[in-house]
């Protein structure tokens, strides 16, 4: 099993880097999707 890798960008909250995007909980989302990824504005 592949373990989730936390991004080096601490502006991201509760997200893990999955290939080209983030996985927030069980919901895949785009890197630039602030609402789904919970990024700090």
Swiss-Prot record:
Q: Note the SS bond partners.
A: 15-26, 17-24, 29-37
Keyword check for Disulfide bond, yes or no: yes
Molecular function GO labels: serine-type endopeptidase inhibitor activity
- Report which superkingdom the organism of origin falls in: Eukaryota
Which keywords does UniProt give here? Disulfide bond, Protease inhibitor, Serine protease inhibitor
- Residues under site feature: Interaction with trypsin: 20, 30
Role description: Has two active sites that simultaneously bind and inhibit trypsin.
Protein's recorded name:
Trypsin inhibitor
The lineage, from the top, is: Eukaryota, Viridiplantae, Streptophyta, Embryophyta, Tracheophyta
């Amino acid at each position: 099993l592949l373990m989730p890798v936390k991004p080096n960008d601490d502006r991201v909250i509760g997200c893990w880097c999955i290939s080209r995007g983030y996985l927030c909980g069980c919901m895949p989302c785009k890197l630039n999707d602030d609402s789904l990824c919970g990024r700090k504005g």
